[in-house]
């Protein structure tokens, strides 16, 4: 392990050394650029583009182009990138992650690689976590790019396809990660090429890259259509599970007895019925066997009702507002507008909370951020905290994390954690600490992990008469404004996790003298990176600052991972005094060890997600590629359709003519021919008693050929025939693909059970997924055969 760390450290140093050489060359152009007139500086853009056309590479242009962007920033924005920002920009250009501390000017850093890469004219996407940041950065930094002769676009959720297309056709496009992903999926659902909005994915710079590629890696982007579903099923399942009790016995108990109706595995957040629970379900619903095939839907509803009632926590995982269940992002603490849990979980939570149950949706297209961003030709990112996830970035995205030095030394004091026996004693201590600092006028930012904690603390501060602002998923409309004011004298701000990320906290007048911004964490997050983000809110650009985490044995992390050892240790020291505070290296080590375990666990889950999603990725790329060829076609698709129909004929005829002629299933064969290929009259004219298999196939091929010619004559216009062919293929492919996505999702959820049979679930998923994909292709060809052969020709066919 030590050797790996040493190697990473050396790689980092080696890369920085290489970047230093480039940075010095950029600095070497500074005088030359400063002497140019505005017109001469602006003329550099067409000059660079001409040089690229003649074969000069972006790497060759880097020093001069960076110097142009740097000088342009000074003239247009009044900001001149420091040497460390040039280093960060170089790291981004070479497809790395630039780890830069809060307040080190990541937005300005990105202008240089954005300018350089935009010169190719293939499009650069600057990706942010929300539309506020996209709009802000496009407005501010867009001035520079426009001044330098580039086009700049902003891609928003509310825009029409025409507006989006215009934004994507610009040299530089600002967008959120979700909008990029959804536009990609929508582009692969269109039926006319002109409806597409995106160009091929070229280069992206992701701001807050850890938030998007790590925290949201497992979040699939889903485009859904409504599916029929009886809401009463959710209510029945909900009523049943509400009367169950948890089995809290240890896993290592040897007896076969159940101690409750369901069991929860908290580290993986999985829940299942025990045998007692299964017996209760059979009795409650009047069944002989809960797991009979016909009870599949009921089992699904019970599973989701269990998750909704005992795993999903109100005000932590979701909130209820105006009779609606809204998901809370566990990393940002924000409500995820318009996002719904899939597969009926959202409806199960609605049943649990007694609000109106909305229709279950059917997935039409889906992709994870992991697989979407891996499609870019070049990818880079910026964040203040990525080093703890370095291995994941390298393994999954092939990106190295380069720690960029700060422009000024860090003056912030990071104090050791302190631990209390109970939540009450911890919150009491936090309020006292805030009171003391507030009395001196020092601004305080308090970080909480859950909405529940922020509201509890807010109530305690109200009782203490301390004015404060609360920033959580319930009121994020003004979050940027609240965060901007958090550094003013006397300000007390409570923030759930990293709400307001991307907005700097600047210190107000006289605050430096008071010790800068004090950051108090009320709980350790399961990821060290999120804790580091909270710390990084204080001490920007060499400012003074103070940070400390207050913990209790009743914190979620302590309860879930290894709290017993700490509790024993505390019992020995504390003499049963609830207000006794413990500062010990053991506590810090135990917390960090728990965090590392959770991080390792989460990484394994994300890696596994990717392995499973790779099966769908390959299938998705095949379907989307074939679809695009159909949409793009400008001449007859006969050479695609005829082989599809021939394969269908071959498989169906072979299936019905196995064995001796006496064993042939002639009735089924006749049905296939008359229902899928031709009329009953033509079918009756075939002498099935004497014809050979090969002659039958040839006869059917001839019928297909004649049908094709008849349709061409009926339409008269080759473009109309092409349109008809496209309609047939696209309708069938889209219907079958949508069904396949659902089937693969159900396979994914059921596959874990096969692990009990000593089988590798991933291998089983890959094998079953491959078979299902082949079956889907076969079904597509069968449906295309029937639709093409039996469809009546009409003018003005609509896709």
Curated annotation (Swiss-Prot):
Membrane topology term: Peripheral membrane protein
Reaction(s) catalysed (UniProt annotation): ATP + H2O + cellular proteinSide 1 = ADP + phosphate + cellular proteinSide 2
BP GO terms, sorted: intracellular protein transmembrane transport; protein import; protein targeting; protein transport by the Sec complex
Secretion signal, residue range per the UniProt entry: none
Residues noted as binding ATP in the record, renumbered to the chain: 85, 103-107, 504
Domain of life: Bacteria
Gene3D superfamilies: Helical scaffold and wing domains of SecA (1.10.3060.10), P-loop containing nucleotide triphosphate hydrolases (3.40.50.300), SecA, preprotein cross-linking domain (3.90.1440.10)
Enzyme kind, highest EC tier: translocase
An example Gene Ontology CC term for this record: cytosol
Main subcellular localisation: membrane
E.C. number: 7.4.2.8
UniProt-listed SMART domains: SecA_DEAD (SM00957), SecA_PP_bind (SM00958)
Annotated SUPFAM superfamilies: Helical scaffold and wing domains of SecA (SSF81886), P-loop containing nucleoside triphosphate hydrolases (SSF52540), Pre-protein crosslinking domain of SecA (SSF81767)
One Pfam family matching this protein: P-loop_SecA
Keywords: ATP-binding, Cell membrane, Cytoplasm, Membrane, Nucleotide-binding, Protein transport, Translocase, Translocation, Transport
Gene Ontology MF, one: protein-exporting ATPase activity
Family to which this protein belongs: Belongs to the SecA family.
General function of this protein: Part of the Sec protein translocase complex. Interacts with the SecYEG preprotein conducting channel. Has a central role in coupling the hydrolysis of ATP to the transfer of proteins into and across the cell membrane, serving as an ATP-driven molecular motor driving the stepwise translocation of polypeptide chains across the membrane.
Assembly behavior: Monomer and homodimer. Part of the essential Sec protein translocation apparatus which comprises SecA, SecYEG and auxiliary proteins SecDF. Other proteins may also be involved.
UniProt-listed HAMAP family: SecA
Name this protein carries in UniProt: Protein translocase subunit SecA
Organism: Lactobacillus helveticus (strain DPC 4571)
